[in-house]
């Protein structure tokens, strides 16, 4: 939100964007829970949502189109993903006697992500400008004499943001336990939950402080160094490898893969999902680098055919994999991707002739959110084919 406010010269204020995206996610989260209760098909839900998204995108600018899709990826982080996954499993467990219980345990993260896109596109209908982006990217600070200085600068800000994010969940839990819960938790269970919250707070503060204070500049410098070589082949290879490896450091990825293995009782192996997810993200970063190197290539050249493929596959592959794939798309675009890989792409753009750092900065997260959906639905097609062979 801060970056969008700066590059649009305040046309989309940070607080307004945060409120609009939050409302969009809240509305779609509610719709997603109703979908689980009434067992409405997930593929039809996503078809309707993305038809609405691309219908609104027709009336938006290319810049806002990229910002909207990036908003969907950057809102599904290390805190929101485990909460949404647990919420989906909890509601789906009410339908445990139905065959759709497994399928309904996934897809909520993907639906919430669509809410963020819709919210930003709707905002663009009311706050509109046909002028190209004219602001500036946040400046990169010079290396401080004290190596701790950047971390100490980020620490209070990150701590405040995490506290703001965790507090509502904790307050709602306590109020529900005190006033509404039929069965009270034991003191031991209550203590474990609060201890877990403390671990969560400390862990996220340390993790996000390190990511924001350390990795941003490293990624930018690496992008400039590799892109400055005589050939474009090295930057394409490095981009793919970074995409494959960075996803392994995303905390929410392990939450999702463990839940997939638990819900499917080992039918869908965690390692296989992680492998296909990594390949998808690697291809997303590679294609983002290609977009920087080829001036006429626009983000919608990727997203429109990409989501057409996704929606077509959603009617062919097992329904379980549709939910898993869309959730994986939200999970893949976490804090590591939104900092290190984003900075890497900006570094490549800085050194590439005719590339616009301002414009190339947006759209990369959207690519990372899209490609894993395709790769995991293809995994679903492989599972389906193997099941048919075993049946024969």
Task: For every predicted segment, state its role.
Residues 1-51, 233-314:
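Helix-loop-helix junctions within the multi-pass membrane cores of secondary transporters/permeases
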Residues 1-6, 46-50, 70, 82-90, ...:
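Re-entrant/interfacial helical elements at transmembrane boundaries that shape
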Residues 1-4, 62-64, 207-220, 247-251:
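Transmembrane alpha-helix boundary signature
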Residues 41-51, 104-110, 188-198, 272-277, ...:
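Cytoplasmic-side transmembrane-helix entry/capping segments in multi-pass membrane proteins
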Residues 23-35, 49-61, 83-93, 111-126, ...:
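Hydrophobic core segments of alpha-helical transmembrane domains in multi-pass membrane transport
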């Amino acid at each position: 939100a801060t970056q969008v406010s700066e590059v649009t010269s305040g046309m989309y204020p940070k607080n307004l964007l945060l409120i609009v995206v939050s409302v969009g996610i809240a509305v779609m989260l509610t719709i997603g829970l109703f979908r689980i209760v009434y067992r409405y098909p997930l593929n039809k839900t996503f078809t309707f949502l993305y038809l609405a998204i691309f219908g609104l995108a027709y009336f938006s600018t290319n810049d806002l189109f990229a910002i909207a899709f990036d908003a969907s990826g950057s809102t599904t982080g290390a805190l929101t993903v485990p909460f949404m996954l647990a919420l989906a499993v909890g509601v789906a467990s009410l339908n445990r006697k139905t065959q759709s219980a497994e399928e309904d345990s996934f897809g909520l993260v993907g639906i919430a992500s669509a809410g963020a896109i819709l919210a930003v596109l709707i905002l663009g209908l009311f706050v509109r400008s046909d002028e190209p982006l004219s602001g500036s990217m946040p400046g990169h600070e010079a290396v401080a004499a004290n190596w701790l200085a950047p971390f100490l600068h980020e620490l209070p800000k990150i701590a405040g943001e995490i506290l703001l994010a965790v507090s509502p969940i904790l307050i709602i839990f306590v109020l529900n336990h005190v006033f509404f819960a039929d069965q009270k938790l034991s003191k031991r269970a209550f203590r474990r939950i609060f201890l877990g919250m403390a671990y969560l707070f400390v862990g996220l503060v340390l993790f996000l402080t390190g990511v924001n204070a350390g990795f941003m500049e490293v990624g930018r410098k690496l992008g400039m160094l590799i892109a400055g070589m005589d050939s474009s082949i090295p930057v394409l290879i490095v981009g793919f490898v970074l995409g494959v490896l960075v996803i392994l450091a995303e905390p929410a990825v392990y939450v999702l893969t463990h839940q997939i293995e638990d819900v499917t009782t080992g039918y869908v192996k965690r390692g296989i999902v992680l492998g296909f997810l990594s390949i998808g993200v690697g291809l997303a970063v590679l294609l983002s680098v290609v977009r920087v190197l080829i001036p006429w290539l626009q983000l919608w050249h990727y997203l429109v055919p990409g989501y057409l493929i996704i929606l077509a596959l959603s009617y062919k592959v097992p329904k379980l994999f549709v939910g898993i794939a869309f959730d994986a798309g939200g999970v893949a675009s976490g804090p590591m991707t939104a900092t290190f890989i984003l900075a890497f792409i900006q570094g490549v753009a800085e050194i590439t002739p005719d590339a616009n750092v301002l414009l190339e900065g947006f759209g990369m997260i959207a690519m990372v959110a899209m490609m894993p959906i395709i790769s995991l639905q293809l995994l679903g097609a492989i599972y389906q084919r193997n099941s048919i062979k075993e049946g024969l």
